[in-house]
Amino acid sequence: MANHSSLPSQKYAASERQEYQKPQQNEEEIFYSVSRAAYLTVFKSSLDNITTKDQLQLVLQQTGRNPSNRVLNKYWTPRTKELNFDDFCAILKKEKPATKNELLKAFRKIDTNNKGYILHNDLYEILTTKGEKMSQEEVNSVFRLAEVNSNGKLDYNKFCSTFFKTCEQCAKVASERMDSNSKAKRQQFGSYIEKSPERSSSPKSSHGNLKLFDSETSTRKENKSSRPSSARSYKATMSTVINMGIPGTRTAKLIEPNNLKDWHTTSTKGCFFLEDNGDIISHHYKLQVSEKSTVYLTIKPLNLSKVEGKPSPWMSVDTSLFILKENNGRADLVSFTELRNQETSGWKGELGVGVYWLIPFTTGCRLRKKKKQTIKEARLVYRDGNEDLVLTPEFKSALSDMFDIIDLDGNGLLSLAEYNFFEMRTSGEKCDLDAWEVCKENFETKKNELTRQGFMELNLMEANDREGDPSDLWVTLQTMGYNKALEMTEACPFVIEVHAEKCSPRLKAVSLESSNKQLQGAVCKSVKLKGDAKPMDRYEDVIVYTYKNDTHVTSVMENKSDEKLILQVNNEQCKNCISSRGLQVFAVELLPKSVMVCQHVMPLNEKQEWMYNCVQNILS
């Protein structure tokens, strides 16, 4: 960001995020279902791998994409041996298909007189000599389409309509082919399963080795016993049943030290953000302890509601902290916040001199993609009697809350470091020192930091730069977790407090990123340390670790064998539960000599009893 005019406007494109109604498939489930249908037009199973660049091109084309050689080379390098279905889905999320408007815009650059058609001779010369050149036969195949060509001219409006209609028909045929066997549809692991009201989201690629299992496996008849699919033959099986009771009746609660007011204290804010692919990113922190001391630290959601008795909707999101110690370039698990008191999760223990990582964590059971519903778009700006642009009260309220979230130290001002976390989230770029000086010259500041009013002025300038077009403002809002009704549905702000008895702790936010690999490793270690271990019947090389506290159950699987295994996980007998996987039945691929998080499970209704009843079966 080199100048103030670009300060608020460098926002990356983000698809509209909206809430959902319960009976509908959610956005992520639809994405995986469509992706899988396209994959199965080329491969027999979604467990088959892409082994050549030509296969990658073909399967991408089945999704309506037409990847250039540059795009193909980005994902299929000289070192690439194969890509799996998860890799394929990741590519689809990065390489969006062209829209009809984009294609029409490209044609209109050629049709400078806006006639609605292009002469074959002109189009032939462009397509065979410019960019990635098409062959003569490829161009002629377009010209042979009778419904869009006449008298040596291509009607590009008709061509675009035909092209996208054909893409839709191909996707529909692929989906119908995948679902043609109604019995197999009941067994689709990793896709939407009907009649399961306790599920509200789809699987996330962030869970390590998750594979979407195919309906080509043998079918399962509906069975309400504690061991479903008893007619099926498994290599091994086991079940875990835990009656959890009512969450509010916990036996061990988080208790503050009596003399906490005499301890040294520091605090900071942060936020979980839900990505389009279901991943969750958050601020990461470094904690410096200068003297061996007893430390008490907590994390809880940040309530921004101004209405007494009506807390912010994200207050039900579970939050925890994992404490890691820097050790010769590694980060070793120290502990995590295990005890709770209402929304607050905390830990008390002794920390030695050194630098520690504090990594916020949420299970993903409650912060998750929502299903779509039609909602009225809020108005962001309007023109007053003098025709000047003005921010609406609703938008100003949302911006004020946003300011409170990114004001990490809570001093009512935004430092350059705090503002840059906001910029990295919304535009992917940082504000350099020169641009920050320009910012301070144009917007209200105090002590070299941006005030709340200055933040409002900055967003108003963005609206003026676009002559009232709110598109860029919506990108900012959506990347910060807001929907079109100005409700924050895909983010959860939180506050962290650190108290040390003998020294002044130093706490600093150092990054805003996904922590899948580091955090998944810490979760696995914590569950292995504190959970119950149980080997699978008839296959003791697979151990299932189950950890429970008052708020959730976490399951971790370890494969000690030298072979890759496919496991079915069945939650159909759970009561009042919601899984981080978003499904009642799914399959996972467990690599040789590996440990992975299977799932997190929480109560759907915290005021009622809940029961964790999970059956795991080795399929192969």
UniProtKB/Swiss-Prot annotation:
Keyword Amino-acid biosynthesis: no
Protein origin, superkingdom: Eukaryota
UniProt entry keywords in alphabetical sequence: Calcium, Cell membrane, Cell projection, Membrane, Metal-binding, Repeat
Alphabetical GO biological process terms: positive regulation of protein localization to ciliary membrane
Compositionally biased intervals (Basic and acidic residues): 213-225
Membrane-topology annotation of the record: Peripheral membrane protein
A GO term, aspect molecular function: calcium ion binding
SMART domains recorded: EFh
Predominant place of localization: membrane
GO CC field: ciliary membrane; plasma membrane protein complex
Record region (Disordered): 1-24, 176-234
Residue ranges of every copy of the EF-hand domain listed in the record: 98-133, 134-169, 394-429
Residues reported in the UniProt entry to bind Ca(2+): 407, 409, 411, 418
Subcellular location: Cell projection, Cilium membrane
Free-text function comment from the UniProt entry: Plays a role in the ciliary Hedgehog (Hh) signaling.
Stated name of the protein: EF-hand calcium-binding domain-containing protein 7
Species annotation: Xenopus laevis (African clawed frog)
